[in-house]
């Protein structure tokens, strides 16, 4: 029964394979294997596009970052490219969607966010404590403002991860539901395929935008620690 097979649409996000060996998580190493330039004697078109994108993003991130150590921007560029490539590869049929899982996203966001927090406390803990009380706050609200600022500080990596996961999950679910709809109405197949191609193109751009948003917010958090 088709109803039984499609009863749980979220099964496509399960990190498991048919041979009872979770090989899907090895896909996270695929961008590192495919794109290193040391294996190219002559620069390929893909590497040319990647280098052009890296130069463009470096100039963009340099404006946002207030750090005097501009070399740190390379970390965020690498993170953005990794998330973008992983998001785009996950649109290929039967490819496991890594960045739809909070586990991977939380590892990326928590690691960087926590390192920024330690860096800020180590360098200037007085400034860190002063940020917990906004300027010109009433005295009777100071304790309450400290609690609010701490909560807003703690939920930052969670909001980053949930935003990325939710956008990817919603996009994949829409494509899946549209594919089920196409299989039930063969008579209007050309129109459905055109709509699905438009949604797929939109999902590709969404994957690029989400990787940019994820990285740019981390840069803003990093600039606060400086």
Curated annotation (Swiss-Prot):
A Gene Ontology molecular function term of the record: proton-transporting ATP synthase activity, rotational mechanism
Keyword Ribosomal protein: no
Transmembrane spans: 22-42, 73-93, 102-122, 135-155, 173-193, 202-222
GO CC, alphabetical: mitochondrial inner membrane; proton-transporting ATP synthase complex
A Pfam family annotated for this UniProt entry: ATP-synt_A
Location within or outside the cell: Mitochondrion inner membrane
Membrane topology value: Multi-pass membrane protein
Source superkingdom: Eukaryota
Assigned keywords, A-Z: ATP synthesis, CF(0), Hydrogen ion transport, Ion transport, Membrane, Mitochondrion, Mitochondrion inner membrane, Transmembrane, Transmembrane helix, Transport
Family: Belongs to the ATPase A chain family.
General function of this protein: Mitochondrial membrane ATP synthase (F(1)F(0) ATP synthase or Complex V) produces ATP from ADP in the presence of a proton gradient across the membrane which is generated by electron transport complexes of the respiratory chain. F-type ATPases consist of two structural domains, F(1) - containing the extramembraneous catalytic core and F(0) - containing the membrane proton channel, linked together by a central stalk and a peripheral stalk. During catalysis, ATP synthesis in the catalytic domain of F(1) is coupled via a rotary mechanism of the central stalk subunits to proton translocation.
Subunit structure: F-type ATPases have 2 components, CF(1) - the catalytic core - and CF(0) - the membrane proton channel. CF(1) has five subunits: alpha(3), beta(3), gamma(1), delta(1), epsilon(1). CF(0) has three main subunits: a, b and c.
The name this protein goes by in its record: ATP synthase subunit a
Source species of the chain: Apis mellifera ligustica
Gene name of the record: ATP6
């Amino acid at each position: 029964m088709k109803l039984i097979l499609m009863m749980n649409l979220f099964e496509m996000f399960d990190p498991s394979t048919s041979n009872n060996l979770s090989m899907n998580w090895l896909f996270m190493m695929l961008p590192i294997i495919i794109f290193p330039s040391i294996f190219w004697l002559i620069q390929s078109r893909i590497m040319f596009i990647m280098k052009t994108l890296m130069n463009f993003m470096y100039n963009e991130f340099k404006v946002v970052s207030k750090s005097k150590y501009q070399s740190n921007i390379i970390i965020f560029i690498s993170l953005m490219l990794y998330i973008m490539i992983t998001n785009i590869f996950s649109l290929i049929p039967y490819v496991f969607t890594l960045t739809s899982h909070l586990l991977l996203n939380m590892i990326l966001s928590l690691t960087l966010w926590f390192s920024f927090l330690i860096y800020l406390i180590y360098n200037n803990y007085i400034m860190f404590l002063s940020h917990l009380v906004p300027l010109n706050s009433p005295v009777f609200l100071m304790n309450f403002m400290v609690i609010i600022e701490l909560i807003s500080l703690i939920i930052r990596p969670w909001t980053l991860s949930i935003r990325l996961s939710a956008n990817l999950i919603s996009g994949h679910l829409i494509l899946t539901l549209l594919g089920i709809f196409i299989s039930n109405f063969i008579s209007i197949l050309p129109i459905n395929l055109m709509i699905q191609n438009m949604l797929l193109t939109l999902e590709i751009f969404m994957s690029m935008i989400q990787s940019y948003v994820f990285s740019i917010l981390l840069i803003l958090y990093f600039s606060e620690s400086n």
